[in-house]
Amino acid sequence: MSDTIAVEIKQLPHAEGLPLPAYQSAHAAGLDLCAANSADAPLLLAPGSYVLVPTGLTIALPENYEAQVRPRSGLAAKHGVTVLNAPGTIDADYRGEIGVLLINHGDAPFTIRRGERIAQMVIAPVVRAELIGVETLSETARGVGGFGSTGR
């Protein structure tokens, strides 16, 4: 299996001057995504509120791949700001702008400025399932034990 795949990316006009997503270390799994809101109009994220942040990017993923939009741990740990629908899924056939749905779980307002790294994008292979209807499922030691059944 190859260590890299080619992913076509296009910057929209409102992302002009911003860096393309990039890995921040040699073994990073995610490419950092930047906010592409206007420099004249920072987004204010009040506690308990959410906002769709533009990235100004569109991508063309190869067939059988997806991109997952995930939180940046520093924003969550320091400010309580995270990706609301984590992980957000970008399908291989989607060609629209990548948006990041951020929510503020913190106690203070959070300002999102143009160019700020707001999320990370992980490219991952997809295995498609063929669902087979059955009358019964095979038995397991766990059985129907659900939430909390394997311990605290």
Swiss-Prot record:
The GO annotation for biological process reads: dUMP biosynthetic process; dUTP catabolic process
Tell me the first and last residues of the signal peptide.
none
UniProt KW Cytoplasm keyword: no
Q: Its annotated pathway? A: Pyrimidine metabolism; dUMP biosynthesis; dUMP from dCTP (dUTP route): step 2/2
Ligand binding (substrate)? 72-74, 85, 89-91
Names of required cofactors: Mg(2+)
InterPro entries, sorted: dUTPase (IPR008181), dUTPase-like (IPR029054), dUTPase-like_sf (IPR036157), dUTPase_trimeric (IPR033704)
EC number(s) from the headed UniProt entry: 3.6.1.23
The UniProt keywords, alphabetically, are: Hydrolase, Magnesium, Metal-binding, Nucleotide metabolism
Pfam families listed in its UniProt record: dUTPase (PF00692)
GO terms of molecular function: dUTP diphosphatase activity; magnesium ion binding
Its recorded reaction(s) are: dUTP + H2O = dUMP + diphosphate + H(+)
**CDD domains cross-referenced by the UniProt entry:** trimeric_dUTPase
The organism's superkingdom is given as: Bacteria
Q: What does this protein do?
A: This enzyme is involved in nucleotide metabolism: it produces dUMP, the immediate precursor of thymidine nucleotides and it decreases the intracellular concentration of dUTP so that uracil cannot be incorporated into DNA.
Entry's family note:
Belongs to the dUTPase family.
What name does UniProt use for this protein? Deoxyuridine 5'-triphosphate nucleotidohydrolase
Q: What gene does the UniProt entry assign to this protein?
A: dut
